[in-house]
Amino acid sequence: DDPRVINLFRQCGEWRLPVLIHSIGPGEGYYGLIDPVGLPNLERLLQQAPDTTVIGHGQGFWSEIAPVDEPRKSGYPTGPVAEEGALPRLLRSYPNLYADISAHSGHNALTRDPAYGVAFLREFSDRILFGTDVCFAGPDDRMPHLGFLRGLLESGEIDRGAFDRITGANLLGILPRLEI
């Protein structure tokens, strides 16, 4: 929520340019925008740059699908989602917030509690973005989240509309139409 970051995000919003944030928790040796437990900095950013599409990504973002403590915020929490965290609350409150499921953090958040993951995908299918990331080594390991989504589609746990929104339509909806 640094004023310089807010200004940058507002400028991007004026040009209809979405911005992806790699969010982390406090600590040394990480990269991205630091945000304490509960995502208060992200919430202030969303409030102060309401015309900017903000795409959340990274461990500090996805760990907040359920309540998390500071030591686990920059990691990959496991186990059932017994209570919702800051992430679902923010998605419900701020229509300019989107969620990128690329990399292990998004995949982990959605698969740590399969029933909750499916419910999350259904509720927020209009603001979840499929992406890829360089953190997976080989081509077969690069996109486990695509196999996960395809499996949910094949089993009927998500419908074709949700699958299509997540895997492409949502992104096309937020990218600016540039005239060349």
Where are the model-predicted features located?
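Mid-to-C-terminal alpha-helical segments outside catalytic/metal-binding sites
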Residues: 124-129, 135-180
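Catalytic pocket-lining loop regions of alpha/beta-barrel enzymes
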Residues: 1-130
